[in-house]
Amino acid sequence: MSNVPTELKYTASHEWVRAEENGVFCVGITDHAQSLLGDMVFVDLPEVGAHIDTGAECAVAESVKAASDIYSPLAGEIVAINGSLEEAPEQVNAAPYDEGWLFRIRADDPAEFAALLSAEGYLAALDE
């Protein structure tokens, strides 16, 4: 069974979102997603300062098995990326909810966060 922390929100496309301060949200891929992809070899992240729409492709995770698009769960401006993934993409596998985070986004509408899936909703989506 995948690790699905209850304090996070999720998307059906396997991104997780953590609320931080001042309308900023941290985004990564779920434990389920990283386990399906296998060992990460490269992560292509969005540009800091870029504006991303909800559901837009904004990053790519490349593993030994496949390359997978990552979609923004919220609309907003990219305010930070996890630059350590350039040298150590395996952090996405080892700690997808901590050191393996991908980017931080300042949401245009922080209320979008409430509409994302709860841990229970995400687990139910996995079972479908």
Swiss-Prot record:
Q: Which organism is it from?
A: Edwardsiella ictaluri (strain 93-146)
Per UniProt, subunit arrangement is: The glycine cleavage system is composed of four proteins: P, T, L and H.
Q: What GO CC terms are in its UniProt record?
A: cytosol; glycine cleavage complex
Please name one Pfam family that this protein belongs to: GCV_H
Domain (Lipoyl-binding): residue spans on this chain: 24-106
Q: Could you tell me what this protein is called?
A: Glycine cleavage system H protein
Tell me where in this chain the PTM N6-lipoyllysine is found: 65
Where is the secretion signal located?
Answer: none
Query: What gene name does this entry carry?
Result: gcvH
Sorted UniProt keywords: Lipoyl
Cofactor list: (R)-lipoate
**Matches recorded under PROSITE patterns:** BIOTINYL_LIPOYL, LIPOYL
- Give the cofactor note text: Binds 1 lipoyl cofactor covalently.
- Name the Gene Ontology biological process terms: glycine decarboxylation via glycine cleavage system
Stated role: The glycine cleavage system catalyzes the degradation of glycine. The H protein shuttles the methylamine group of glycine from the P protein to the T protein.
The record's annotation in InterPro entries points to: 2-oxoA_DH_lipoyl-BS (IPR003016), Biotin_lipoyl (IPR000089), GCV_H (IPR002930), GCV_H/Fam206 (IPR033753), GCV_H_sub (IPR017453), Single_hybrid_motif (IPR011053)
Keyword Iron found: no
Q: Which family does it belong to?
A: Belongs to the GcvH family.
